[in-house]
């Protein structure tokens, strides 16, 4: 057995012992009690050129989400619904083990889970976002940047996405002669439910 592998095993055993001791003493690794929540801080409107945005700090995890609304073609099989696309990026400064480059499998999974949570909650009435059914729909992009990773990444990212969407100002597009025209008018996402 190599010395690096032996060191890893020793560290894993020490960590297990530390966790056992913390459980017995009624504490978590970060010093919180078992029923104590991580502190939550939020700020909305942090990206001025986005249709909506939010910054969330949950414990030591920080996430920024920005919303951009455009028009585009509907997804196949969903011709009469608007499109939602959630993407995520973990900045290399978020944790010591993060490498620069394209998103890894875990980051892609994070974006998919958050995307699915928004869709299946039906917080967005995607069926009301078809401008020309089968041809042109609202396309809502939500880009998430993970600034710091300190646990509970799925919750922090979900909070940021929901806040960014809930506070978005959506452009109003008009249909003239089977074409979409940007009217430059904005309304808040609350109006989408009316």
Describe these PLM feature segments.
Residues 124-130, 142-149:
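Conserved interaction-surface patches within small, structured recognition/assembly domains
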